[in-house]
Amino acid sequence: MNKRTTSSCLALACLTLAWTAHAGPAPDTLAPSATGITTLRCGTLIDGRSATSRRDVAIRIEDGRIVAVGAFAPGAAGTVIDRSQDTCLPGLIDAHAHVLIKTDDYQVDHLRRSSGYKALRGLNVVQEMLWSGWTTVRILGDADVAYAHFDVRTAIQEGLFSGPRLTGAGHYFSITGGGGDLNFIAPEHQVAGDGLVVDGVDAVRKAVREEIKHGSDWIKVLASGAMMSAGNDPNRAHFSPDELAAIVDEATRLGVPVAAHAHSAAGIKASILAGARTIEHGTFMDDESIRLLKEKGVYLVPTLYVGDYYLNEQPGSEAQAKMNELTRKYRAQHIAAVGKAIKAGVNVTVGTDYVGFPVKQGVRELGLLVEAGMTPMQAIQAATRVNAELLGWQDHVGTVEAGKLADIIAVPGDPLHDLSMLEKVSFVMLGGREVLRP
């Protein structure tokens, strides 16, 4: 075993240990919780863990946490909230969003908007996400030279504004000429890319430290080219094995996991072997990629809907002509590969890749996972329990069980028979507090 292999193995061995000491705010500090006793009556409950739903259920909540789940009976304690005509389920978790990105020409918009403006716009987006049922959101880098979404997170933590629990990465790391660089700018212009452009082992280590210093509790690396940015090929691996190993090693030592954007099979495999916890997209994954995902317990966040959105609803977008061409060409292949991963038992989860489409439509990601081979129940669990496990927050969110934070939503009808019901969220509770839309 050579020195590089030994280092990689040690990094992988450390990953589980580091996870228990995950840096960043605890989930229950990310939004204020209610005080007192509340009973929530649900006509039907999908709890995020059980294989079937239950009828006429009472959820007892004390000081923001669930203390009991059982059959409803008259005389329930505390304030009673009646959702007996609705289906209740755990608050949804979006494992992949870019809340500061609002336009299809985001690489140009990155240059025209200030970080302060992006913070205000991002606050609006995350509030819309909360009202639409997303009670936890992992932000995987944003087109901002500063850390505007962490300012949004702090404002929510301090109770200045309502919003979901936020976690994630400040920026996405890109090689020079990669998916986070501005590859349409003449060389004499020195302009900051929408990503964090960084090259070399020492530079990536320093970048990891700076990201964590400024609030990142995930590190995001573009391990391949991208579908949406100009001048790079998503089917090419980016960052050398040494750079990837250094990124994961540095992040792991500091208790922070790594999310790897990887479309190409080579980028996927290199990221898994380096020790990434999640693979984002996975468009060109092959059988060996799927085997490694399963063997290493790495989560796959395929982000299927964003391509459909641009192809079907913005087919004439000049800014996303590349995305539309690639989606048209490779959509079926991507869906089939995700189906293979599901069948192989890979932890496939839900990430909307939000980049400015109507927030309510993000739940259509679940329908595409059903198209790939999941049942509706599996898709709902992917957006709740499995995503909580991805975050390492399974003791706090993701299921409706005693001991968990009372992050609960309700929808009319039965989403197990019609997933579009998830676009009609009628009730949101965050930490036992009912969230009211202004």
Q: What spans do the regions from the language model cover?
A:
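Histidine-rich, glycine-flanked metal-binding segment
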Residues: 24-39, 45, 49-89, 109
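Histidine/acidic-residue-rich catalytic or RNA/ligand-binding cores of hydrolases
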Residues: 104-107, 149, 229-231, 268-274, ...
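Metal-associated gating/positioning segment near the N- to mid-region
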Residues: 86-154, 158, 176, 242, ...
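Acidic, glycine-enriched loop/beta-strand segments at the rims
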Residues: 27-31, 45-58, 71-72, 375-380, ...
